Structure formats: C-alpha cells, structure tokens
Amino acid sequence: MRAVYIKDLKNEIKKGLITVKGDKAHHLQKVARVKIGENILILDGRGLTVTAKVESHGKRELQVKIIESNVIEPNKPSLDLAFCSPKKNASDEILKIATELGINKIYPIYSDYSSRYPFNQERVEKLLESALIQSNNPFFPKFNE
C-alpha cells in the first residue's frame, strides 16, 4: 500500500474526506501511479494512521475517503540515537535507517575526528519524511542539532 505523510492531518479531514495537494498528490498520481479505488496509507508523524480510498483526482490534488483511522501509542522506552557525524552521504544513510527503525530522537555529535558541516534542516526533514513513508513508521523523529 502506498503511503503519504501529511503533517497537519487532523486539520485536513473534512466530512470523512481528505484532499492531498501539491507535490504529494503529484507523486501519488504520476510516480506511484495510484488509481481511483486504490487504498493508500496517510501518516501524520504523531501516531495517527489513516487508511483511505482514492475517490477522484485532479491536476495537482487527490480526494480520498477515510476507511479506517488508528492512533498508535509511542514505543516505551523511547529510543534515542546520538552519532558522531561521518561524511555527508553516510550521515544521510544513518538518518534514513534510524527513522526506519523507529528511533524517536536523533542527536548529531561533533568530536575531534568527526566531520563538521552544518545540517540543512529542510534537507534533513525531507530525508526523514522519505524514510518515514518508505517504512510506514507512524512517528516522525525529532532531529536535535
């Protein structure tokens, strides 16, 4: 089942329908090629998961009807990850895998032998979002720089 991440999902629900707009709708239509009648999974990153059926689609939006919604409790104990920052590509891989494994908080640490480069917060959020969708993880990790 294809998944999509919508940050403010509770605000998007109107009479049992959700409108997926912009790049997310484009991705579902053109890249994932979801069809009318197909089910998708919508995640809000805070434990709310919604299974929805595609009702209609326009140029840059998708109307979906809610079939089922679940609120998942966070894992206890909370899993945190602190890592010394290696090269940039390796850091990206660490962030992706940590998200897929269900890590709640990620802390990059700078030491004498680690790479020192600033993390672009927007880029990190896109990496975490893609890993969240890939793994259907209902919780978006916090990245504390």
What are these regions (language model features)?
Residues M1-V71, E122:
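N-terminal positively charged helical leader segments and presequences
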Residues I72-E145:
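RNA substrate-binding interface of SAM-dependent RNA methyltransferases
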